[in-house]
Design a protein with these regions (language model features):
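C-terminal-biased regions
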Residues: 1-65
C-alpha cells in the first residue's frame, strides 16, 4: 500500500471515530481534533483535509450540537 493510500485509510478511520465522539455527545472535542488534523493535512494532502472539513460540518449539525 502506498503512503498516500495508507494516509487516506487512516483518515477514514479517524473520521469514523470523530463521528462516534459526536454521536456520544462530545462534538466540540471532535471538532477540535478534526481542526488540528485539517491543519496538518491542508498543504500536502488537500483531499484528505477536505474530508475532515466535511466531517467538521457534519459534527456541527443540530443533532450533534
Amino acid at each position: 500500500m502506498s503512503k498516500d493510500a495508507t494516509l487516506s485509510s487512516l483518515n477514514q478511520i479517524f473520521i469514523r471515530a470523530l463521528k462516534r465522539m459526536g454521536d456520544a455527545g462530545d462534538a466540540d472535542a471532535a471538532c477540535r481534533l478534526a481542526a488540528q488534523a485539517w491543519s496538518l493535512l491542508r498543504q500536502d494532502w488537500p483531499k484528505e483535509a477536505q474530508r475532515l472539513n466535511g466531517a467538521m460540518h457534519s459534527l456541527t449539525k443540530p443533532d450533534h450540537a
